[in-house]
Amino acid sequence: MNLLAAGIAAGLAAVGGAIAVAIIVKATLEGVTRQPELRGSLQTLMFIGVPLAEAVPIIAIVVSFILLFT
């Protein structure tokens, strides 16, 4: 049962992280398309937002490993 729960948690975390990164990149590209002069600031915000969006799946995978090995 723990193996199944850990696998589901890791899989959902990976899918959630991929969706979050896709939304962030999509919004950045739309912003750059509308206002090319803001490219630098939008790119900076994207480079801050992507790791924050990836932090939650990484934590979920760590929790699933803890659940798996205890």
From Swiss-Prot:
The protein's UniProt keywords, in alphabetical order, are:
ATP synthesis, Cell membrane, CF(0), Hydrogen ion transport, Ion transport, Lipid-binding, Membrane, Transmembrane, Transmembrane helix, Transport
- Report the PROSITE patterns cross-referenced here: ATPASE_C
For membrane topology, the record states: Multi-pass membrane protein
Domain of life, source organism? Bacteria
Location within or outside the cell: Cell membrane
Q: Where is this site: Reversibly protonated during proton transport?
A: E54
Positions of transmembrane segments: 5-25, 47-67
- Coarse class of the protein's main subcellular location: membrane
Pfam families, per database record: ATP-synt_C
Gene3D superfamilies (alphabetical): F1F0 ATP synthase subunit C (1.20.20.10)
Asked if the Swiss-Prot or TrEMBL record annotates the protein with the keyword Cell cycle, the reply is no
- Record's Gene Ontology CC terms? plasma membrane; proton-transporting ATP synthase complex; proton-transporting two-sector ATPase complex, proton-transporting domain
Q: Which InterPro entries match?
A: ATP_synth_csu_bac/chlpt (IPR005953), ATP_synth_F0_csu (IPR000454), ATP_synth_F0_csu_DDCD_BS (IPR020537), ATP_synth_F0_csu_sf (IPR038662), ATPase_proteolipid_c-like_dom (IPR002379), F/V-ATP_Csub_sf (IPR035921)
Question: What are the coiled-coil residue ranges?
Answer: none
- Can you name one GO molecular function term for this protein? lipid binding
Answer whether the UniProt record assigns the keyword Metal-binding to this protein.
no
Q: How does it assemble?
A: F-type ATPases have 2 components, F(1) - the catalytic core - and F(0) - the membrane proton channel. F(1) has five subunits: alpha(3), beta(3), gamma(1), delta(1), epsilon(1). F(0) has three main subunits: a(1), b(2) and c(10-14). The alpha and beta chains form an alternating ring which encloses part of the gamma chain. F(1) is attached to F(0) by a central stalk formed by the gamma and epsilon chains, while a peripheral stalk is formed by the delta and b chains.
Q: Could you say which protein family the record assigns here?
A: Belongs to the ATPase C chain family.
Function, in words: F(1)F(0) ATP synthase produces ATP from ADP in the presence of a proton or sodium gradient. F-type ATPases consist of two structural domains, F(1) containing the extramembraneous catalytic core and F(0) containing the membrane proton channel, linked together by a central stalk and a peripheral stalk. During catalysis, ATP synthesis in the catalytic domain of F(1) is coupled via a rotary mechanism of the central stalk subunits to proton translocation.
List the NCBIfam families hit by this protein, alphabetically: ATP_synt_c, PRK06876.1
Annotated protein name in UniProt: ATP synthase subunit c
Species this chain originates from? Halalkalibacterium halodurans (strain ATCC BAA-125 / DSM 18197 / FERM 7344 / JCM 9153 / C-125) (Bacillus halodurans)
